[in-house]
């Protein structure tokens, strides 16, 4: 599983919530942990 550094959830959860589009820190973190955050 692809878990990011934020305790709020996995990259999948972040992507579903739209945070990747709205937050640069989530995009950067997801890129480090599990590839591009679309």
UniProtKB/Swiss-Prot annotation:
The keyword Disulfide bond applies. Keywords: Disulfide bond, Ion channel impairing toxin, Nematocyst, Neurotoxin, Potassium channel impairing toxin, Secreted, Toxin, Voltage-gated potassium channel impairing toxin. Disulfide bonds join 2-37, 11-30, 20-34. GO terms for biological process: envenomation resulting in negative regulation of voltage-gated potassium channel activity in another organism. The keyword Secreted applies. It is found in: Secreted; Nematocyst. Its main location: secreted. Pfam families: ShK. GO terms for molecular function: potassium channel inhibitor activity; toxin activity. InterPro entries: ShKT_dom. Residues 2-37 form the ShKT domain. GO terms for cellular component: extracellular region; nematocyst. Residues 25-26 are annotated as: Crucial for binding to potassium channels. The record marks 6, 13, 23 as: Important for binding to potassium channels. Belongs to the sea anemone type 1 potassium channel toxin family. Type 1b subfamily. No cytolytic activity on erythrocytes detected. Not active on rKv1.4/KCNA4 and rKv1.5/KCNA5 channels. Inhibits voltage-gated potassium channels (IC(50)=405.0 nM for rKCNA1/Kv1.1, IC(50)=0.03 nM for rKCNA2/Kv1.2, IC(50)=1.31 nM for rKCNA6/Kv1.6, IC(50)=74.11 nM for hKCNA3/Kv1.3, and IC(50)=247.69 nM for insect Shaker IR). Binds the Shaker IR channels in a voltage-independent manner. This is Kappa-actitoxin-Bcs3a.
């Amino acid at each position: 599983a692809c878990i990011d550094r934020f305790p709020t959830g996995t990259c999948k959860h972040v992507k579903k919530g739209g945070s990747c589009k709205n937050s640069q820190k989530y995009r950067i973190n997801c890129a480090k942990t599990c590839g591009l955050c679309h």
